[in-house]
């Protein structure tokens, strides 16, 4: 119970993540690994559990097997307490022979789950962002303002509005207009160059949500941002929750207390990793008072047999033999052989970097074998001929692309 209300959560975890290709070639976006031993979905699930929201349905669709296995291994809540569960829900075709047609449709097709739990409030959260949030504070705001629906909001630069739902509010914080990914938008009052954007996190009063979903479905509307929320602006009381007011315990003075990143592109995903590195990171992965949970790991600790390591994170089971690693994140069971150099890079699980190989500004997905002496990130044209390279020059080696 939060603010005297029972709460049910739906997590939108069915996204294809085409802008993260090739990392999403064999997995959904929420299942993409992040940092030392997490996956992107772990952030929203940790925020829900830390906020004492334990009734959680995870709605999946696109290439979901990797995500399903991760939830099975990592996210088992006690079955002894009623309404303590994290349940994966693939498309059930409850409304006919079709998959989920959008975010709102995925909840509409599972209205029977709401009827089963009978919560006072329903929270609908995305699964593809890196952040910490005490969701109880947003729920309290929803109750205190007598809202029908509440949208978590954050300021963004005007040049990014085409990637977000854009909100216009009155002086009391009531949403008067909602546009999904417009080409342009008016700046916030007294804040030139900045617009107010939806974070894709919502709180609904249950009866309002059920009615709005039913109405949207009857008109062919399948998406919260495109259809449901714009239609509700005039007919219902929609409030914007200022994410910058959210306070999570354990945040250090040097951290960005309002850190939130959409990691839906390769460049954004790459940059977010480096926000976790250094002596004073913008986002510290370690916070005992608000942990980001991950799968239990039985692997042995990392071993370094000489070499040079600076401002790096090494996962369990990593083996470094007289190699150089700078400003990089190395995930579990990676082997870095003698004379190899890794700089400004992310190397994922069970990859071997051969002797004398050099890697910089790259993302190496799981299960790769980098041959001895190979160079990645030093010749853009040569890299483009073999790998995916972003416009900013980040090289991505797909999962298992390079074999021994």
UniProtKB/Swiss-Prot annotation:
Pfam families: Hexapep_GlmU, NTP_transferase. Alpha-D-glucose 1-phosphate binds at residues 165, 180-181, 198. Its EC number is 2.7.7.27. Pathway: Glycan biosynthesis; glycogen biosynthesis. InterPro entries: ADP-Glc_PPase, ADP_Glu_pyroP_CS, GlgC_bac, GlmU/GlgC-like_hexapep, NTP_transferase_dom, Nucleotide-diphossugar_trans, Trimer_LpxA-like_sf. The keyword RNA-binding does not apply. It comes from the Bacteria. Keywords: ATP-binding, Carbohydrate metabolism, Glycogen biosynthesis, Glycogen metabolism, Nucleotide-binding, Nucleotidyltransferase, Transferase. GO terms for molecular function: ATP binding; glucose-1-phosphate adenylyltransferase activity. The keyword Transferase applies. Disulfide bonds: none annotated. It catalyses: alpha-D-glucose 1-phosphate + ATP + H(+) = ADP-alpha-D-glucose + diphosphate. Homotetramer. Involved in the biosynthesis of ADP-glucose, a building block required for the elongation reactions to produce glycogen. Catalyzes the reaction between ATP and alpha-D-glucose 1-phosphate (G1P) to produce pyrophosphate and ADP-Glc. Belongs to the bacterial/plant glucose-1-phosphate adenylyltransferase family. This is Glucose-1-phosphate adenylyltransferase. It comes from Azoarcus sp. (strain BH72).
């Amino acid at each position: 119970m939060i603010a005297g209300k029972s709460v049910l959560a739906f997590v939108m975890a069915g996204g294809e993540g085409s802008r993260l290709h090739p990392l999403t070639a064999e997995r959904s976006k929420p299942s993409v690994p992040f940092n030392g031993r997490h996956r992107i979905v772990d952030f929203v699930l940790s925020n829900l559990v830390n906020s004492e929201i334990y009734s959680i349905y995870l709605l999946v669709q696109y290439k979901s097997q990797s995500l399903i296995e991760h939830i099975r291994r990592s996210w088992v809540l006690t079955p002894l307490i009623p309404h303590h569960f994290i349940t994966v829900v693939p498309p059930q075709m409850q409304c006919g022979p079709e998959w989920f047609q959008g975010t709102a449709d995925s909840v509409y097709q599972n209205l029977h789950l709401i009827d089963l739990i009978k919560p006072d409030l329903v929270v609908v959260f995305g699964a593809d962002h890196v952040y910490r949030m005490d969701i109880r504070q947003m729920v309290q705001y929803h109750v205190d303002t007598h809202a029908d629906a509440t949208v978590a909001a954050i300021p963004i630069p005007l040049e990014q509005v085409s990637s977000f739902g854009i909100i216009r509010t009155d002086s009391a914080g009531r949403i008067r207009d909602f546009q999904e990914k417009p080409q342009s938008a008016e700046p916030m009052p007294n804040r030139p160059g900045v617009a107010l954007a939806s974070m894709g996190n919502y709180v609904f009063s249950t009866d309002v949500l059920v009615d709005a979903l039913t109405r949207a479905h009857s008109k062919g509307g399948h998406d919260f941002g495109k259809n449901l929320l714009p239609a509700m602006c005039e007919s219902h009381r929609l409030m914007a929750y200022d994410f910058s007011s959210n306070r999570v315990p354990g945040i250090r003075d040097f951290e960005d207390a309002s850190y939130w990143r959409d990691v839906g592109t390769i460049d954004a995903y790459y940059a977010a990793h480096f926000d976790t590195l250094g002596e004073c990171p913008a986002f510290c992965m370690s916070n005992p008072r608000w942990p980001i949970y991950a799968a239990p790991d039985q692997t042995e600790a990392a071993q370094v047999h000489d070499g040079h390591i600076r401002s790096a994170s090494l996962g369990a089971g990593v083996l470094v033999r007289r190699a150089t690693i700078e400003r990089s994140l190395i995930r579990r069971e990676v082997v870095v052989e003698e004379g190899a150099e890794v700089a400004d890079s992310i190397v994922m699980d069970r990859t071997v970097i051969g002797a004398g190989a050099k890697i910089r500004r790259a993302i190496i997905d799981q299960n790769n074998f980098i041959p001895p002496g190979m160079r990645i990130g030093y010749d853009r044209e040569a890299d483009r001929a073999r790998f995916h390279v972003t416009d900013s020059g980040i090289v991505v080696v797909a999962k298992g692309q390079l074999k021994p």
